[in-house]
């Protein structure tokens, strides 16, 4: 039997403690979401009550059904659009624009990543309102697409820098135009960055609260995150319903990570974030 050194044993203890501390809020949310209102008041947050009740989940889902559908619609479309546009922009910068201009253009586009969203809220609301897209799902799609392009462009550009220029030059010699080079040469090599960028964008857009609360009112286009923040009673907070709602809203991103997690790791290790 292999002996464990005292240093390694101590490291394991620390890691187990940190993992338990990290998972404690999730466990608290699960236990609270399976209690009645009276049980929430009479027990500690980490205490599990048997038998559990699932009435809070039914109540939370009834309240969140429309906002979750709204979030699924605009998150899916904004993720697709921003990822595709970022890929095309990344190909253009990395393979069509050469030299210093390429790096300068990438730096200019990447500036949008560091621009605080709060600083552009007033002009954003005015623009969206003037287009007749306030409180519309299309307005959220356009907003998240526009503000996703800088990060998707950066990720794709750094990946495309790693693809040998000889492949592009060979395609040009064969008479391929830029679009054919992109679709026939670059795109088949882009599975890794598409998975990484798609998961990143979907998670960020799904979890966004700021744009949702500023650009919507009522439930016609309200995202799930905004409705979740309002999921409380008039005078008393229904913690069991709120915790059930939080777990329901977290479910889509969790399922995506479970389904595509192995591709995400492959994307990282294959250089999707290199550069």
From Swiss-Prot:
Matching SUPFAM superfamilies: MetI-like
Membrane topology of this protein: Multi-pass membrane protein
ABC transmembrane type-1 domain span: 68-260
UniProtKB keywords: Cell membrane, Membrane, Transmembrane, Transmembrane helix, Transport
Keyword flag tRNA-binding: no
Function according to Swiss-Prot or TrEMBL: Probably part of a binding-protein-dependent transport system PH1214/15/16. Probably responsible for the translocation of the substrate across the membrane.
Name of the molecule in the record: Probable ABC transporter permease protein PH1216
Organism, scientific name: Pyrococcus horikoshii (strain ATCC 700860 / DSM 12428 / JCM 9974 / NBRC 100139 / OT-3)
């Amino acid at each position: 039997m292999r002996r464990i050194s005292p240093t390694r044993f101590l490291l394991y203890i620390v890691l187990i403690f940190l993992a338990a501390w990290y998972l404690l809020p999730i466990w608290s949310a699960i236990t609270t979401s399976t209690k009645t209102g009276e049980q929430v008041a009479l027990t500690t947050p980490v205490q599990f009550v048997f038998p559990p009740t699932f009435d809070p989940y039914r109540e939370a889902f009834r309240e969140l059904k429309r906002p979750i559908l709204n979030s699924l619609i605009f998150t899916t479309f904004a993720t697709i659009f921003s990822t595709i546009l970022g890929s095309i922009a990344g190909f253009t910068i990395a393979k069509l624009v050469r030299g210093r201009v390429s790096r300068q253009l990438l730096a200019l586009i990447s500036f949008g990543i560091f621009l605080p969203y709060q600083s552009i809220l007033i002009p954003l609301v005015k623009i969206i309102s003037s287009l007749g897209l306030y409180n519309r799902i299309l307005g959220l799609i356009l907003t998240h697409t526009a503000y996703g392009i800088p990060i998707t462009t950066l990720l794709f550009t750094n990946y495309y820098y790693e693809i040998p220029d000889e492949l592009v030059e060979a395609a040009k010699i064969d008479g391929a135009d830029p679009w054919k080079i992109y679709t026939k040469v670059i795109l088949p090599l882009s599975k890794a960055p598409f998975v990484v960028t798609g998961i990143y964008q979907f998670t960020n857009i799904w979890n966004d609260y700021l744009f949702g609360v500023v650009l919507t009112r009522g439930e016609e286009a309200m995202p799930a995150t905004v409705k979740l923040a309002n999921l409380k009673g008039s005078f008393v907070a229904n913690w069991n319903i709120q915790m059930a709602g939080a777990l329901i809203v977290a479910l889509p991103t969790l399922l995506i990570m479970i389904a595509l997690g192995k591709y995400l790791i492959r994307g990282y290790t294959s250089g999707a974030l290199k550069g």
